Structure formats: C-alpha cells, structure tokens
Amino acid sequence: MTNKVSLDKSKIKFVLFEGVHQSALDTLHAAGYTNIDYYKKALDGDELKEAIKDVHFIGLRSRTHLTAEMIEAAPKLIAVGCFCIGTNQVDLNAAKARGIPVFNAPFSNTRSVAELVLGEILLLMRNVPQANAEVHRGVWNKSATGSHEVRGKKLGIIGYGHIGSQLSIIAESLGMDVYFYDIENKLPLGNAKQVRSLEELLSSCDVVSLHVPELPSTKNLMNVARIAQLKQGAILINAARGTVVDIDALAQALKDGKLQGAAIDVFPVEPASINEEFISPLREFDNVILTPHIGGSTAEAQENIGFEVAGKFVKYSDNGSTLSSVNFPEVSLPEHEGTKRLLHIHENRPGILNKLNQIFVEANLNIAAQYLQTDPKIGYVVVDVETNDASPLLTKLKEIDGTIRARVLY
C-alpha cells in the first residue's frame, strides 16, 4: 500500500551525532529519507542548538545531552533516537511534555556486553591482568597461586534482563554455576537459580556481575556495606551504569585485599573526549581491568543498533508506531485503504477522546480504525478516517483543550 505523506520525505530532516553506524543511514535512505546531517562527534552548547534548530528527528549516542533547554531549541522535533541502551542523556519528561517519543536499542548490543564480561571473568580468575602488567615491567612471576578455572565456580548476576540472561547462558556453557537476583520474579534459563535476597548472592558467589539500569534505587548499589558482604577473594564486574558502584569503596576494598580483582567499564564521571584525562583511584591496581565504556562497542552491535533505532524512526514517521518507546504510550495501528491517518497527543485528562470523536461525528465521517494508549501524563491516539481531506479535521483537533501535538500523517 502506498500513501502520500503529509510532508514530503525530502523535507523531513534528520541529524545523527557521534558517528552512528552506516546501517542507520542505509535504513533511512532505503525508506526514502535523504535529508540527513551527519556528525562524527558529540556537540553541546550553542553548537548543538544550531545543529538541531530545524530538525524533525535527532539520533545520538551517550555523549550528546538533550536537556529540556535543548529540546526547546528544536521546535520542529518529532522524535529522538538513542543509538545505545541508556537514555539518561535525554530529558525524557521534557520530551514527553512536548509530545516527543524517545526510542533506544535495548537488545542490539546484548551479546557484545555479555561476551566482554565473560572474557573479563576468565582473565581475572587466572590473574592475567596482574601477570600482564608484571611482564610489561620485566617481572617473570610464573605462579599458579590464586589462579583458577571458571568451571564449577559460582557466578552471581544482579539484574536478569537481556544482558544478564545472555551472560547466564554462555557462562553456564563453560561450566559455571549461575545464580541471579532481580527485583522481579524471572524465568531462569538453563540451570540458573534465582536467589531471594541480594545478601545471599553477594555472600555466596565467586564472581558478581552487575546488569541493572540507572535508577535512584541503584545509585551506589555496591557501596561499602554491600562490598563488605562479598566473599573474601571475590571478583566484581560492572558493565551496567557508572553510578551503580561506589568507586572509592571499591578502591578501599582492593587495597584491603578483600577482592581478587574487578572489571569496570562504566564510571560515574567519564571523559568527554580522548583529549581529556581519565581520573580514577582504580588506575593504581594491576588486578583491575578498566575499559572506556566499550561494552557495546563492537562492529556487530553498532550495526544492529543502527538498524534497530533507524527502523523505529521510519515506523514512527511512516505510520505513527511508538512501539518500544521509553517515554511514550505504545501504539501501533495497521494501515487501512482509503483513509487519512491523524495523530493526536494530549494531556491525559477526562473528556478529550470524546471531544476528538465528536469532531468526526459533526463532519459525518466514519472512523475506520482508532487506537488509544495512555500513561499517567499523556494520551496518544491514532485515527484512520474515511475522508479525502483531513486538513479541516486537523485544525479542529489542534483546538481541543489539552492538545500537545496533532498532525496528519498521510
């Protein structure tokens, strides 16, 4: 089915920051979107405002920050895509208040992060980071002391989501006994076992790997008290969010010999560029693997992320689908022949849907299909109407008190 969109695709403007993968450009081009500005780096301040002032879609990774002020500087903005898992670089509430859905890629780098963590487990269990550092310094310290196979060791996973469960599968294939803690009851994969308390997991596992989102409840999840609950000689890995581990508490535990080692890929404060020095008390420890937030930085993951997020842009632009948006009611309505599609985003208050439908009743028009979803703050309705001219309808929809945004899609 082919429909004439309300705005020619050549006039719909995209801007992509931070060198997102070519697959994103390919996906947009294949769908007919060619008006794309592309930046290999993050922008901020007035430079960012200038770059986004006339755009409809913004694509970014983790270093471009869309604050409420920046969102206001983009009056034509329709949607935002985070070409990564995290969305804390975007003011989600400010975007919602403007009727702007935000999309991300919660699945595409799952395998890459899980593989990095597994590799770190193998290296730390064999004391490879220390051995590597010593040999670089000319020290030939051939020893089996403290070096272990992973087979039969207990892996504790905190957060059994996409990455945590993927790690569970591949770790078990190497013979590890997998335990996990999650605030929700989850179906264990393979022979993994869910424990009922965080304390039980921390005190019993040889390796603990963190896979939780950045929330107020997870800030400094691994603090002095929790680190003290770890087994003597345990290994701690964080490839989740930088605020989850109290870095000073971890450094002290390493100084005290509490842990065999650690691997940290994310930090509370990270350099903005390669020209800025990375500062951390963890730099002094040979038994700590430090990586610059590269958990999802593989060619395969970045390619998949490009396809996934750009694909969500296309669906929202073409048919209004908001499936998997992180800040918006999820709506997807199949297309219907011989109709015009209108989108209406409004404050979630009583009577708005009734007023909306009354407009079609007064125009003596049949609604071929309608889909409404709400969250506590906003409602989003997609309407397919049997008419040849939707312009008068759009004018009336915009006049409804409580309307945030309304437009004719096609």
From Swiss-Prot:
Active site as annotated: 241, 270, 293
Q: Provide this UniProt record's keywords sorted from A to Z.
A: Amino-acid biosynthesis, NAD, Oxidoreductase, Serine biosynthesis
Q: Which reaction does it catalyse?
A: (2R)-3-phosphoglycerate + NAD(+) = 3-phosphooxypyruvate + NADH + H(+); (R)-2-hydroxyglutarate + NAD(+) = 2-oxoglutarate + NADH + H(+)
Q: Name one GO biological process term.
A: L-serine biosynthetic process
* Residues binding NAD(+), per UniProt: 162-163, 182, 239-241, 265, 293-296
Please verify whether the record's keywords include NAD. Answer: yes
Signal peptide coordinates: none
PANTHER family in the record: D-ISOMER SPECIFIC 2-HYDROXYACID DEHYDROGENASE CATALYTIC DOMAIN-CONTAINING PROTEIN-RELATED (PTHR43761:SF1), D-ISOMER SPECIFIC 2-HYDROXYACID DEHYDROGENASE FAMILY PROTEIN (AFU_ORTHOLOGUE AFUA_1G13630) (PTHR43761)
Chain's role? Catalyzes the reversible oxidation of 3-phospho-D-glycerate to 3-phosphonooxypyruvate, the first step of the phosphorylated L-serine biosynthesis pathway. Also catalyzes the reversible oxidation of 2-hydroxyglutarate to 2-oxoglutarate.
For this entry, the protein name equals D-3-phosphoglycerate dehydrogenase
State the gene name recorded for this protein. Answer: serA
